[in-house]
Structure formats: C-alpha cells, structure tokens
C-alpha cells in the first residue's frame, strides 16, 4: 500500500516494505521517494547522480551523498559540521573538511573523530585538543592516537 498523503510540493511517497514504517515524502525536486527504516529519525533526498539514498540514524545531524563509486552510505557524527564521502574500507566513520583532496581513514582506536586538515595525504590520527587541527602521519604508533 502506497502512502500518498504528502503535503503540497511533495511527490507521492513510495510503498513501504515491511521493515519500513512509514515511507517518507520527498520534495518535488527529487526524482524518487525514499523509504525510512524504523531506526531512522528522517531520511535524506539525494541527487539523481547519487546512489543510494542515505538514512539518518538518530545520532546524526546531517548525512552525506555517496557517489556511485562508493558501495555503502555513511553517517556523519554529530560533531561534524559538514559531510564527506568515506570509502567502505574506512572504519570507523570519519568526517573531513570539504577542502580535503581525499578521504581519511582513522584507526579504530582513535577517539573522538575530528576534522582532517586538507594537507593530510595519508591516514592518521588528529588531536581534538589542538586549536588548529593537526594530522599525524600513519607512521605514528596507534597508542599515540586520541
């Protein structure tokens, strides 16, 4: 059964599969509706060129558009001001400044997640206590991480 009770300006929402309750209504600028899993507060509309749509867990304030070259969507921690595409191989999820040339993988032992300076060329740990973000090369031992 499709949900069509959308406010003006929205396209008809999609049919909600059993794990999704309810389906969401998306702005007319979006090509397709998206379905919101039970554990999500809200969903996000992504441009036609991006696949798939990203789901926003309760702890996330914003989401990220994942290019077709990436295999899975990622969630941006609350402390991040902007989002970034992170390769599937990166664990855990990290955030990086929009000016970064490439994604940054931060070792699992690093806490908390912080912004990566655009000058960072390889994986490393960034110290949140510094007034200006510092990127530590991967050559540093894991024990020296945040």
Curated annotation (Swiss-Prot):
<protein>
    <recommendedName>
        <fullName>Keratin-associated protein 12-2</fullName>
    </recommendedName>
</protein>
<feature type="repeat" description="6">
    <location>
        <begin position="40"/>
        <end position="44"/>
    </location>
</feature>
<dbReference type="GO" id="GO:0005882">
    <property type="term" value="C:intermediate filament"/>
</dbReference>
<feature type="repeat" description="9">
    <location>
        <begin position="60"/>
        <end position="64"/>
    </location>
</feature>
<feature type="repeat" description="16">
    <location>
        <begin position="95"/>
        <end position="99"/>
    </location>
</feature>
<feature type="repeat" description="7">
    <location>
        <begin position="45"/>
        <end position="49"/>
    </location>
</feature>
<dbReference type="Pfam" id="PF05287">
    <property type="entry name" value="PMG"/>
</dbReference>
<feature type="repeat" description="23">
    <location>
        <begin position="135"/>
        <end position="139"/>
    </location>
</feature>
<comment type="similarity">
    <text>Belongs to the KRTAP type 12 family.</text>
</comment>
<comment type="function">
    <text>In the hair cortex, hair keratin intermediate filaments are embedded in an interfilamentous matrix, consisting of hair keratin-associated proteins (KRTAP), which are essential for the formation of a rigid and resistant hair shaft through their extensive disulfide bond cross-linking with abundant cysteine residues of hair keratins. The matrix proteins include the high-sulfur and high-glycine-tyrosine keratins.</text>
</comment>
<feature type="repeat" description="12">
    <location>
        <begin position="75"/>
        <end position="79"/>
    </location>
</feature>
<feature type="repeat" description="17">
    <location>
        <begin position="100"/>
        <end position="104"/>
    </location>
</feature>
<feature type="repeat" description="1">
    <location>
        <begin position="10"/>
        <end position="14"/>
    </location>
</feature>
<feature type="repeat" description="4">
    <location>
        <begin position="25"/>
        <end position="29"/>
    </location>
</feature>
<feature type="repeat" description="10">
    <location>
        <begin position="65"/>
        <end position="69"/>
    </location>
</feature>
<feature type="repeat" description="15">
    <location>
        <begin position="90"/>
        <end position="94"/>
    </location>
</feature>
<dbReference type="GO" id="GO:0005829">
    <property type="term" value="C:cytosol"/>
</dbReference>
<dbReference type="InterPro" id="IPR007951">
    <property type="entry name" value="KRTAP_PMG"/>
</dbReference>
<feature type="repeat" description="2">
    <location>
        <begin position="15"/>
        <end position="19"/>
    </location>
</feature>
<feature type="repeat" description="3">
    <location>
        <begin position="20"/>
        <end position="24"/>
    </location>
</feature>
<feature type="repeat" description="19">
    <location>
        <begin position="110"/>
        <end position="114"/>
    </location>
</feature>
<feature type="region of interest" description="23 X 5 AA approximate repeats">
    <location>
        <begin position="10"/>
        <end position="139"/>
    </location>
</feature>
<feature type="repeat" description="21">
    <location>
        <begin position="125"/>
        <end position="129"/>
    </location>
</feature>
<feature type="repeat" description="18">
    <location>
        <begin position="105"/>
        <end position="109"/>
    </location>
</feature>
<feature type="repeat" description="8">
    <location>
        <begin position="55"/>
        <end position="59"/>
    </location>
</feature>
<keyword id="KW-0416">Keratin</keyword>
<feature type="repeat" description="14">
    <location>
        <begin position="85"/>
        <end position="89"/>
    </location>
</feature>
<feature type="repeat" description="5">
    <location>
        <begin position="34"/>
        <end position="38"/>
    </location>
</feature>
<comment type="subunit">
    <text>Interacts with hair keratins.</text>
</comment>
<feature type="repeat" description="20">
    <location>
        <begin position="120"/>
        <end position="124"/>
    </location>
</feature>
<feature type="repeat" description="11">
    <location>
        <begin position="70"/>
        <end position="74"/>
    </location>
</feature>
<feature type="repeat" description="22">
    <location>
        <begin position="130"/>
        <end position="134"/>
    </location>
</feature>
<feature type="repeat" description="13">
    <location>
        <begin position="80"/>
        <end position="84"/>
    </location>
</feature>
<keyword id="KW-0677">Repeat</keyword>
